Amino acid sequence: EVQGQGTACFIAAGLRLSPEDSDIVLQRLRAWQERRAATQPLEWPSCGSVFRNPPGDHAARLIEAAELKGLRYGDAEVSTQHANFIINRGAARAEEIEALVANVQQEVLNRFGIELQPEMRVIGEVADV
């Protein structure tokens, strides 16, 4: 896990691997893929988890408790399958996604007093929302 902000990046990594039966590895991979398919909206483009989990809670639970699943701005939508995913239902523009992120943050703050922190990093200009 990488924490903090800034321009740090990985330039190398060391791995310690041990031999394993390929059938067992494939079985684990399939199980992992099935869990992902059951819990994440893989049929739509997204950037994955939008918000970090606040201490002692889950961003998805807070978003769902705020009744924001399915909220849409244009083609950007809070996934009805996993509330911490914003999906692109076609031609979502960056402005729509940014506005939806800001709205979710504000609603969760208003209802629960918790400020959700983005997991993603926006690169480039941020539009006025």
Regions found by a protein language model. Give the residues of each.
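Phosphate/pyrophosphate- and phosphate-bearing ligand-binding catalytic cores of soluble enzymes
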Residues: E1-A99, E107-V129
